[in-house]
Regions:
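C-terminal transmembrane helical hairpin of 12-TM major facilitator-type secondary transporters
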Residues: 289-333
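Juxtamembrane intracellular "pre-TM" segments in multi-pass secondary transporters
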Residues: 1-16, 199-229
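Helix-loop boundary and gating motifs at the non-cytosolic
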Residues: 4-65, 227-232, 236-254, 261
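Multi-pass alpha-helical transporter architecture, strongest
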Residues: 103-104, 189-198, 382-413
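Loop-to-transmembrane helix entry/capping segments in MFS-fold secondary transporters
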Residues: 51-52, 140-151, 258-259, 343-353
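C-terminal ends and interior cores of transmembrane alpha-helices
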Residues: 90-108, 297-310
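Helix-to-loop junctions at the C-terminal end of transmembrane segments
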Residues: 67-83, 171, 274-288, 372-373
Length: 413
């Protein structure tokens, strides 16, 4: 029995375990950026902004996440102080920390918050690209992209438990400056961890290296699989989601306190950690196409469950269950993105696919926020479920088995 459990553990070598710890540490620190979000939302609600306007604010602040391929190109083409990843990681973590401290200094104007929070997001988005590049570069040769991403997202959702519990208290007491101050500490943690854990050989900016990278980019731009996967991810994530609209429903219709809403977020995050733990061994044993189909089905069922979201008990049950299955769904799509990345330009093209993913999520939340204002909660749930289900009809066009086979062949080279 013990031997069977050991075989389920995907990280069998010391090097793989070191990388897993590194990714977990950096992603945990990154996840703490979301600490002020609930307090920002309730502060704007107190100021009279609608759900759609709040969703628009968060869309503005996440613009840096939509141009992530630019950061990948910079990192792939232009080494900083002789390194493609580590030097940039130190610089971007410092930027995020500085902007967070400026936000903590006070002032709750819409424009000021949007500017500084967007700049903080720029530092974190660039950091995310660099860490994802390390994940693809080290994970694909070992067949561990799915397992590494499980560790990354388990770490983020572990931090989300803290965000949910502490963020609920901060929102309840309207302590926005304190929320920013706490969030600003964690990019500093990322900076110290990068200094200690990232081992990267020098990569001088030679002309031939730039030419090779540019040739790889041009070849990848003509790769059908990359663009089909990008379109598929965009379609799936676009379906109108709840986002800030759910908080308005929880507050205005159900009368939940901000503390209880924060607790729901923490419980959902704990379930997401469990979902990531389930996906790690599944990703090495179940064909990805089957996982994608299963992910879409459970996303539809999970969305429809929100029709029963009527009181505290149903909220706890639905948020916990959807937290777990939602994590499995998300990881299946991120695993597909990692396996579709062309070799040699991993930072650029994984960032491209993640920008598509993040862009779809933001469009989804803005659309969902305005639909909630216009048609209400129940029609929003039904529309979201129907569009999610439609993604099943696109699966055959993706040719997922071919993408998996090519990723395996690339790893063997």
């Amino acid at each position: 029995m013990l031997q069977r459990l050991r075989r389920l553990h995907p990280f069998q070598t010391p090097d793989a375990r070191r990388l897993a710890v590194l990714f977990a540490m950096v992603y945990f620190a990154q996840g703490m950026w979301y600490l002020p979000n609930q307090t920002i939302t309730i502060t704007f609600k107190d100021q009279g902004l609608s759900a759609g306007q709040v969703a628009t604010f968060f869309s503005i602040t996440t613009v840096p996440w939509l141009v992530k391929p630019l950061y990948g190109l910079i990192s792939d083409f232009v080494p900083l102080f002789g390194r493609r990843r580590k030097s940039y990681l130190i610089l971007t973590s410092g930027l995020a920390a500085a902007c967070g401290m400026a936000l903590a200094a006070g002032g709750q104007g819409y424009a000021r918050l949007a500017t500084l929070f967007t700049a903080m997001g720029l530092g974190l988005a660039f950091t995310d690209v660099l860490v994802d590049a390390l994940m693809v570069e080290n994970g694909r040769p070992r067949g561990l992209t799915g397992a590494f991403q499980s560790v990354q997202w388990a770490a983020i959702y572990t931090s989300t438990i803290v965000v949910g519990l502490l963020g609920g208290w901060l929102a309840e007491h309207r302590r926005l400056a304190l929320a920013f101050g706490i969030a600003a500490l964690f990019p500093l943690v990322s900076l110290s961890l990068v200094t200690l854990f990232v081992r990267e050989p020098p990569a001088p900016a030679e002309r031939e290296t730039v030419r090779q990278t540019w040739r790889a980019v041009r070849a990848a731009l003509g790769d059908r699989d990359v663009w089909v996967v990008a379109g598929f991810i965009l379609f799936f994530t676009f379906s109108p989601s709840f986002g800030p609209a759910l908080l308005y429903y929880q507050t205005d219709r159900l009368g939940f306190s901000q503390q209880f809403i924060g607790l729901l977020g923490a419980l959902s995050a704990a379930a997401a950690v469990a979902g990531a733990a389930v996906y790690a061994p599944l990703s090495r044993r179940v064909p990805l196409e089957r996982l994608i189909r299963l992910a879409i089905v459970i996303a539809v069922v999970g969305t429809l469950a929100y029709l029963l979201y009527r009181d505290r008990t149903s909220a706890v049950v639905i948020d916990v269950v959807f937290g777990g299955v939602g994590m499995i769904t998300q990881l299946a799509f991120l695993d597909l993105a990692a396996k579709a990345c062309p070799r040699g330009v991993e930072a650029t093209f994984f960032a491209l696919l993640m920008s598509v993913y993040n862009g779809g999520v933001q469009i989804s939340q803005v659309t969902g926020g305005y639909l909630y204002d216009w048609v209400g909660y129940t029609p929003l749930v039904l529309i979201s479920a129907a569009l999610t289900a439609a993604a099943l009809f696109l699966v055959p066009a993706i040719r997922i088995p071919r993408i998996e086979a090519r990723a395996a062949a690339t790893a063997a080279v």
